[in-house]
Design a protein with these regions (language model features):
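Tandem repeat scaffolds
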Residues: 1-96
Length: 96
């Protein structure tokens, strides 16, 4: 039987998640600043009101992940700065 993984208002700044199965996990109000996710299965996970500042995600499964109301400043996924990508996409959309 699958165990539900819920992180509620946890202070996990600088945490390292390696080779974890966190599919469908719920992160609510969690501080994940400077955290590292490496080889982690996150499909279907939900991140709400979280701090992902300067977090790094490498070789992660992000299928159907939801990130709402989050600080993503400096968030890097597979070497890509997410906030910069969003800013560039918004600029392209307004110039069309």
């Amino acid at each position: 039987m699958s165990e539900s993984k819920r992180f509620d208002r946890e202070q996990l700044a600088g945490a390292m998640f390696n080779e974890c199965r966190l599919a469908q996990a719920e992160f609510q109000g969690v501080n994940l600043a400077d955290s590292r996710f490496t080889d982690v299965k996150l499909q279907g996970a939900v991140f709400t009101d979280v701090n992902l500042q300067d977090a790094k995600l490498t070789n992660v499964n992000l299928a159907n992940v939801s990130i709402d109301d989050a600080n993503i400043s400096g968030l890097t996924i597979m070497g890509w700065n997410v906030a910069e990508l969003i800013t560039q996409a918004k600029k392209r959309n307004t110039s069309v």
